[in-house]
Amino acid sequence: EYILFDDCYMSTVEVAYDLKNVTNHLIASTCEIMAYGMPYAKIGQYLIGEINYEKICNGFDDFYSNYEMPCGTIAVTDCAELDHLAAIMKDINSQYTFDTTLTGSLQRLDGYSPVIFFDCGDYVSKLCSNQELLAQFNEQLNRTVPFKRNTEYFYSMSRGKVKIETFS
């Protein structure tokens, strides 16, 4: 039914696409996850039996919003939707080339230098100027990632707290 990663940087479109034929859903963080890891005492009941992805995300967010270092992101990816997302991305990529001067304006999701993890929706919003195609992408992204939550900041061991302006 699902794979839950209690690890950093596993909620990326690349990871999801690689595993799309292995599982129905991925539950993971886009960023570094605090040493405490997944708050199983809060979300465990939603992981067993009748899975409730929304409550998993809400429980994670509730826990980390009140944690000593209130930083965290979680997302659920519906792997059945990934081919549709890839088809729209193929269309966008065939029409547009990313202006690398905009790289610094993208929502970073890591502490690396140079940055290697960005918010996918933010990237596409700066790549695609066709509003109709961008709307199609965003609608499909919302179907592909139906549940997600984030605190105001994410934590990076190398940068400390980093503000989250966009989380898709």
Please describe what each predicted stretch is.
Residues E1-S168:
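Terminal, contiguous helix-loop blocks that mediate binding/assembly
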